[in-house]
Amino acid sequence: MVHEIGKTNSIFNHFIAEIRDEEVQKDSLRFRRNLERIGEILGYEISKTLTYKETEVKTPLGEANVELMTEQPVIASILRAGLTLHNGLLNTFDKAENAFISAYRRPTGTDEIDVMVEYKACPDLTDKTLIIADPMLATGLSMALVFEALLKNGTPKKIHIAAAIASRSAIDMLKKNLPIPTDIWVGSIDENLNAKSYIVPGLGDAGDLAYGVKL
């Protein structure tokens, strides 16, 4: 299932607008903070789907019954662009386990896209809820390869993908090719990719905007 959060008017859309704005992007601290806020809100929305149990909490004046989550998810992010989104999700799920994986485009000299997946640090995922954070879903290829690599650490009972912006083609590709039913939570879905497989209108390169241009 795909959840496009920006379709409902809220403060969330201001954060999406600011990460797109080429003038606001010049302030990398603000860019990172906005992605972090987006992660916090995506985490809040995902939290509504988790399992809860009524729990008694003692107050100074008595007891209160509150529905609390029965487990914390595992939050995985794709380095390096996913780190700010990861931090936002971790602000929401502050007792979550964490996983990190690298995925990057390797130049081929052609129009073909070659994605490399190398470093991985991940706990056992068996029967856990997994949230994979990546701010931009352009072609969906990186996410599909990361998905495959993470599943070598066990099969989660539920998987969520959290992204700020996705292309329509990436959404379609992931819906068709992911081996396990997955909920995709995204701020906005853009219709086009350019010749270099960047989302249009998108926002540019999220990793460079957050952490500086890479060599």
Task: Describe the function of each predicted region.
Residues 1-215:
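PRPP-associated nucleotide enzymes
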